[in-house]
């Protein structure tokens, strides 16, 4: 591949879709068809490098690959970006699309248009991309090709004939798709003579080479040896290597307008190559950064503690190393009276939280326990400044003037027959309906504004069970709203157990308190004395369960005789148990914490 490629011969496109609609399989066939990967070296989900991606069959990190394709007797360079499909990684999708001029919207012929399809479509439209509608999995017996084609054409307001049919499994229609991309997608724009500007759309950590930064050149040329500058932080580095992924790394002398490739500077911290930032050079410095950069904000917070208290420093080291490859993790040290030393971590969503816990276990051999997920509340105590509270333990005591909770705009796509049960679920979760839109004769999109706290527990599971698995949903931050929230504490023998505290809506305080009290009463071993488990809001107890005492039969040795002898023994036992209740402590086994907290994730 020559170093200099004319912008007119470059086509940059992304593949976007809902989870499990065949993005990575289509990418595999494109790699084979263009000759980038030989049949011998080919494997499923070739671009998904993380073992979790391969096991779960999902894409977590965006991947860009440079391919060559001949069309109309001219050789073109195709830069293909395979993006994540899960709602947690929407920011990553939006920055990846900023590196493209066209987007292939992929819809599973067996599933039809789903919520994340619409969300990604809106992202593509915001980035002014040419939309190429494609129906995948058309070879499956269960595929409703005609119905899905009609639905996709209605959503995009295009002709039915414009929707392409492909099969990533068999390769049907893939050649025609690549030809269409070359003919319809616009070439990249940019000025080769102006100050260099490169958009960072992804960065990964390589244990041998340090941070590998994936970029799209928007203006100018950047060469090996140039001193580059990050426009958001002003940090400067010398460029050690420039190249493209083909799909394996292939070093080059330079990258110019329209090209997509990677930079290596030897930096070991991925936070210094922030996704969405603009790179320029020290000698010919650009003054205006590329638009759209923002730091992805964590939406869900949870405490992570090592099961073995001696592994606190190992957990810190594990999180530090994960942060190298995933800049969106946020964590600060915290202490729990029940669980010991750990970290309060911020995540993009529940899937992100699950993946981080799994990577800590698999990559660093750390067994951890996570507290129930919570969100960030804005709490204003009477006569004091507003506090941002992410941990129920930090909930202020005393009179509170106002509490605000974060809200999200939720889009739910479902077959029409389940609309009633979905509306019932959303209303139970304090959702406010914003609108409903029908697609064809079988599907509808429901728009709700809901508190984020109501969807981080089990909303997805409840939605799937009420719709037999057919509904899908997507959400975006919407702002915040005042709410009637309270802190529910769980007391064992009158002592608070901070690991079980939660901030909940006042209407759900009783149900939360009674359910967790009941669960604890079933899990905590019986003691020599009676143990009360109470759920309390401040000093007011809202729910209670009692673990009955283990009772020794002290009169077993009395085979007859005077009844007063038995009464004396029973009275002595009663006094001993009363004394034990005063001074006794309830030891809660680690397994009880694990079982109780895991049931509330």
From Swiss-Prot:
Entry-linked NCBIfam families: lepA (TIGR01393), small_GTP (TIGR00231)
Binding site residues for GTP: 20-25
Domain of life: Bacteria
Keyword list, A-Z: Cell membrane, GTP-binding, Hydrolase, Membrane, Nucleotide-binding, Protein biosynthesis
Catalytically driven reaction(s): GTP + H2O = GDP + phosphate + H(+)
EC class name: hydrolase
Name listed for the protein in its UniProt record: Elongation factor 4
Molecular function via GO: GTP binding; GTPase activity; ribosome binding; translation elongation factor activity
A single GO BP: positive regulation of translation
InterPro entries (UniProt xref): EF-4 (IPR006297), EFG_III/V (IPR035647), EFG_V-like (IPR000640), EFTu-like_2 (IPR004161), G_TR_CS (IPR031157), LepA_C_sf (IPR038363), LepA_CTD (IPR013842), LepA_IV (IPR035654)
Native organism taxonomy: Bacteria, Bacillati, Actinomycetota, Actinomycetes, Micrococcales
Domain annotation tr-type G: ranges: 8-189
Broad class of where this protein is predominantly found: membrane
One GO CC term, this protein: plasma membrane
Protein family (similarity comment): Belongs to the TRAFAC class translation factor GTPase superfamily. Classic translation factor GTPase family. LepA subfamily.
Enzyme Commission code(s) on record: 3.6.5.n1
């Amino acid at each position: 591949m020559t170093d200099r490629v004319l912008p007119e011969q470059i086509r940059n496109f992304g593949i976007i879709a809902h989870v499990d609609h065949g993005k990575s399989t289509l990418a595999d066939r494109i790699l084979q068809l263009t000759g980038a990967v030989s049949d011998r070296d080919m494997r499923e989900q070739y671009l998904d490098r993380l073992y979790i991606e391969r096991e779960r069959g999902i894409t977590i990190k965006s991947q860009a690959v440079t391919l060559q394709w001949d069309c109309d007797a001219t050789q073109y360079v195709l830069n293909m970006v395979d993006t994540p499909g899960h709602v947690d990684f929407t920011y990553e999708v939006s920055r990846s699309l900023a590196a493209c001029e066209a987007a292939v919207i992929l819809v599973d012929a067996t599933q039809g248009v789903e919520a994340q399809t619409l969300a990604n479509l809106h992202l593509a439209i915001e980035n002014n991309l040419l939309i190429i509608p494609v129906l995948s999995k058309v070879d499956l017996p269960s595929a409703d090709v005609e119905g899905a084609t009609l639905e996709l054409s209605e959503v995009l307001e295009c002709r039915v004939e414009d929707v392409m049919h492909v099969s990533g499994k068999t390769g049907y229609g893939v050649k025609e798709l690549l030809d269409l991309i070359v003919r319809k997608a616009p070439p990249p724009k940019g000025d080769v003579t102006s100050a260099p500007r490169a958009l960072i759309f992804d960065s990964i950590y390589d244990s041998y080479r340090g941070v590998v930064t994936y970029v799209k050149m928007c203006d100018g040329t950047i060469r090996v040896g140039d001193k580059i500058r990050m426009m958001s932080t002003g940090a400067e580095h010398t460029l050690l290597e420039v190249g493209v992924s083909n799909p394996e790394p292939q070093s080059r002398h330079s990258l110019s307008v329209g090209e997509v490739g990677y930079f290596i500077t030897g930096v070991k911290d991925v936070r210094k190559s922030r996704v969405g930032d603009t790179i320029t050079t020290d000698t010919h410095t650009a003054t205006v950064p590329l638009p759209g950069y923002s730091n992805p904000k964590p939406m869900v917070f949870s405490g992570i503690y090592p099961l073995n208290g001696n592994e606190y420093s190992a957990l810190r080291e594990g999180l530090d190393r994960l942060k190298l490859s995933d800049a969106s993790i946020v964590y600060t040290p915290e202490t729990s009276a029940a669980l010991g030393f750990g970290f309060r971590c911020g995540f993009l969503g529940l899937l992100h939280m699950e993946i981080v816990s799994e990577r800590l276990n698999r990559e660093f051999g750390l067994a951890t326990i996570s507290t129930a997920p919570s969100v960030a509340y804005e709490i204003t105590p009477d006569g004091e400044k507003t506090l941002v509270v992410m941990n129920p333990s930090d909930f202020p005591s005393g009179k509170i003037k106002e509490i605000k909770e974060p809200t999200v705009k939720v889009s739910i796509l479902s077959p029409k027959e389940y609309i009633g049960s979905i509306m019932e679920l959303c209303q139970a979760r304090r959702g406010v309906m914003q609108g409903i839109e029908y697609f064809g004769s079988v599907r509808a999109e429901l728009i709700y504004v809901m508190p984020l706290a109501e969807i981080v527990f089990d909303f997805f599971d409840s939605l799937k069970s009420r719709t037999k698995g057919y509904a899908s949903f997507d959400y975006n931050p919407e702002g915040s709203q005042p709410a009637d929230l309270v802190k529910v504490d769980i007391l064992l023998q009158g002592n608070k157990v901070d690991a079980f505290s939660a901030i909940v809506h006042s209407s759900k305080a009783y149900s939360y308190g009674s359910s967790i009290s009941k669960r604890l009463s079933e899990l905590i071993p019986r003691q020599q004395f009676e143990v009360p488990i109470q759920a309390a809001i401040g000093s007011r107890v809202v729910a209670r369960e009692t673990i009955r005492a283990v009772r020794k039969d002290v009169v077993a040795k009395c085979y007859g005789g005077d009844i007063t002898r038995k009464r004396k023994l029973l009275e002595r036992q009663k006094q001993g148990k009363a004394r034990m209740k005063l001074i006794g402590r309830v030891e809660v086994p680690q397994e009880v914490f694990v079982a109780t907290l895991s049931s509330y994730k």
